[in-house]
Design a protein with these regions (language model features):
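Short, polar loop/linker segments at the starts of domains and inter-domain junctions
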Residues: 41-55
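Solvent-exposed loop and beta-edge segments used for protein-protein assembly and interaction
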Residues: 24-26, 63-65, 127
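Generic recognition of flexible, low-complexity loop/linker segments
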Residues: 18-20, 58-59, 269, 378-380
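Extended charged/polar low-complexity repeat regions
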Residues: 52, 67-467
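Short alpha-helical segments and helix-capping/turn motifs at coil-helix boundaries
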Residues: 14-19, 55-57, 63-67
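Intrinsically disordered, low-complexity segments enriched in small residues
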Residues: 1-45, 118-123
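Extracellular/virion structural assembly segments
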Residues: 38, 46-48, 65, 70-71
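N-terminal targeting and processing segments
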Residues: 34-35, 56-59, 91
Length: 467
């Protein structure tokens, strides 16, 4: 649920769902996108290279506790799994995500991930120290391992593995790989400094420390003949968004392309600017044009109070003492205020139209069970224990029922208010194989062994084949 530009009123969080900075075509391409959330989880992963509050796809981290595994995803959420033995898997029904521990050559034949498991290199499947995550039987796998590093001179070998795992690569259902290269030694030890995508392209990620950014700011001030601004050489080691080592991503270069080896760009594909407190301040595209700018709270590092697309008005935000958004100010459009009560959120726009959200559940399982619209109408929703929609009642009192599969959450049946039903059927890979409407007519789909659609039969009998 989002409101305005945008805010998640259920969490009281300022969010930016996904802004893509790099996306070149090809098999299993490297896509660099940014998501932001002002929400603070109770078990945060360390701050990533885009600064507090921000996440990118590579910011997936698994914490290994005594009896618990905590997967921090790139949306800022923390997913809990029980301890896994080699070859065991855990499944989050609320997020439709599997976590599997390596250590076996094959999964049980009846397992939904059995075929996808075989797409992995044998080395990964047999390693009990690696974990693999996916949100679909179609893949891809996120490979969670550890970064190789150069041991200290006095270190006892072999060194124990760390109590966490980081993203080291992706593997799709065709066995194609994307590799994240972590620095083995030096000031950026353990950080991602390179990526090789499924097309064989290599990207170099240029990182900087807080001290390097401070020195650069001083040199720019000297060359410009201005007074240097207050730019500290170090940052506090902890924020509300997790531990912070102060390392940030400053630019991404394409350094190798097998298709165009002699025609590489002479400038970075994207460049980032930073505040003296290590917060993402600006994004520049490959033409060095600033396309985004961000402003943060003076007291709370990483809490966004304004953002702007170049050439558009600046949108501003205000928060309460609990860190929840209370106002969203848009000088060229609708502004919003948010009032939080127990199990009730009131949203009022600048035209004095009001919506009231009645909620049940907590944190990530909080759902809107009743919505009072600005026109006075009311809609209601029912959810199961893991937050999946079971029924919706419209303003006229008509109820539509939904039947999700117990395991996958995929909708298997929809019953409209007049009692007419549509049924949906899926294969072991969660792909739709047939759908029958209230009129009894059927849509059918067929796939090859790799899960690619090869034939579709329309309800009128027309057949379309794909090659």
């Amino acid at each position: 649920v989002t409101s305005g530009h945008p805010v998640n009123p259920l969490l009281g969080a300022k969010v930016l769902p996904g802004e893509t900075d790099i996306a070149l075509p090809g098999p299993l391409p490297f896509i660099l996108s940014r998501t932001y959330s002002s929400y603070r989880t109770k078990t945060p992963a360390p701050v990533g290279s885009l600064g507090p509050g921000w996440k990118m796809p590579a910011d997936i981290r698994l914490q290994l506790r005594d009896n618990t595994l905590i997967l921090s995803d790139n949306g800022g959420r923390s997913l809990y799994f029980e301890h896994l033995f080699p070859g065991e898997d855990g499944y989050s029904r609320s997020e439709s995500l599997w976590l599997v521990r390596g250590g076996v050559a094959k999964l049980d034949e009846g397992h939904r991930l059995a075929a996808l498991w075989q797409a992995l290199p044998e080395e990964l499947r047999l390693s009990p120290h690696r974990y693999l995550a996916t949100n679909s039987p179609q893949g891809p796998w996120w490979v969670l391992g550890w970064c190789e590093r150069v041991p200290e001179a006095d270190e006892v070998l072999p060194a124990p593995l760390p109590p966490y795992r980081v993203l080291t690569g992706l593997v799709d259902r065709f066995g194609r790989t994307q590799t994240f290269h972590h620095e083995a030694a030096g000031e950026f030890s353990g950080e991602i400094t390179g990526v090789t995508d499924g097309a064989g392209r290599h990207f170099r990620l240029v990182l900087t420390t807080q001290a390097q950014r401070a020195e650069e700011a001083r040199q720019q001030a000297i060359s410009g003949g201005t007074e240097p601004s207050a730019f500290p050489d170090t940052l506090p080691g902890y924020t509300e968004y997790g531990r912070d080592n102060g390392i940030r991503l400053s630019a991404v270069w394409l350094t190798h392309d097998p298709e165009y080896p002699e025609n590489l760009p002479a400038a970075p594909l994207v460049r980032y600017g930073w505040t003296p407190r290590g917060e993402l301040a600006a994004v520049y595209d490959r033409s060095n044009t600033q396309v985004r700018s961000f402003t943060y709270d003076d007291k709370y590092r990483g809490r966004m109070v304004a953002h702007r697309h170049t050439g558009r008005p600046e949108i501003r935000y205000r928060y309460d003492s609990d860190g929840r958004v209370t106002e969203q100010l848009n000088p060229a459009g609708l502004s919003y205020t948010y009032q939080y009560e127990k199990d009730r959120i009131t949203i009022t726009d600048s035209l004095d139209r009001r919506e009231v959200l009645h909620t049940q559940g907590e944190a990530g399982l909080k759902r809107v069970v009743k919505k009072e619209h600005a026109d006075g109408s009311v809609t209601q929703s029912q959810f199961d224990a893991v937050g999946r929609l079971r029924a919706q009642t419209d303003a006229a009192g008509r109820t539509t029922e939904y039947s999700p599969d117990v395991v996958t959450g995929l909708i298997t049946r929809i019953t409209t208010p007049d009692g007419r039903a549509s049924a949906f059927y899926y294969n072991h890979h969660n792909q739709l194989t047939s759908a029958t409407g209230p009129d009894g007519l059927e849509l059918r789909r067929e796939y090859d062994e790799s899960g690619r659609l090869i034939q579709e039969t329309a309800p009128d009998g027309d057949i379309t084949r794909y090659r």
